[in-house]
Amino acid sequence: MTNDNTKNVVVSSRVRLARNAAKIPFPQKGITVEEVAYLVKCADKAADFEHQLVFMSDLRDVDRQALVERHLISPDLAKKDLGALLISDDDSIAVMINEEDHIRAQCIKNGFRLQECYNAIDRYDDNLSKVMDVAYDSEFGYLTACLT
């Protein structure tokens, strides 16, 4: 019997979550520039890591496609001008603003590092809940536009 370690290789780990502001309609229902500005402000305040804030309206199509290919934004956000991306300096944490949900945060790290990813996103979520009233229902939990 041979020991085939190729079956045990983990290329990357990802943890992500979606959060919505309690008093702002989901993006599919229509959202104003002022509401997106509020979400950007909250997302930025919640970040306790070095990061850049990029507005989708400032990006060329080729830059948007590069971010999609690097799994930092979704194809849906790439099509929008009214949205933003907050990205950590090491590219491990990306926060999409005004995608399917108001805030879509993710952490991606190489290898099998789910706990590290979870810890980073959990900390961000804790910080976000301090600066934004998050849409939550006692029966259904966090309210989201997308159940995945």
Spans of model-derived segments:
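Long, Pro/Ser/Thr-rich low-complexity/intrinsically disordered regulatory tracts in eukaryotic proteins
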Residues: M1-E139
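Conserved phosphate/anionic-ligand binding catalytic regions in large, soluble enzymes, centered on
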Residues: F140-L147
